[in-house]
Swiss-Prot record:
It comes from the Bacteria. One of its GO terms (cellular component) is extracellular region. Its main location: secreted. Residues 1-38 form the signal peptide. Belongs to the mycobacterial A85 antigen family. May have a role in host tissue attachment, whereby ligands may include the serum protein fibronectin and small sugars. This is MPT51 antigen. It is found in: Secreted. GO terms for molecular function: acyltransferase activity. Homodimer. Keywords: Acyltransferase, Secreted, Signal, Transferase. Coiled coil: none annotated.
Length: 66
């Protein structure tokens, strides 16, 4: 019985160590190379006669045909 308890305790210590190591790696801040900002977009209100209201449409800047 004491062998089973010893193995169980060893397994628990191993699992806690692996969890601590994983959390340490996951919580490290990523290297920041520059200021991040969202891509520019243009927002238009397009009238829809069928729906009886204006529909907001957003176009992203850039792309292969820009």
């Amino acid at each position: 019985m004491t062998v089973v308890r010893g193995v169980s305790a060893l397994l628990r210590v191993f699992c806690i160590a692996m969890l601590a190591a994983g959390l340490g790696v996951a919580l490290q801040p990523a290297a920041v190379t520059g200021a991040a900002r969202a891509a520019g977009y243009e927002s238009l209100m397009v009238p829809s006669a069928a729906m009886g209201r204006d529909i907001p449409v957003a176009f992203l800047a850039g792309g292969p045909h820009a």
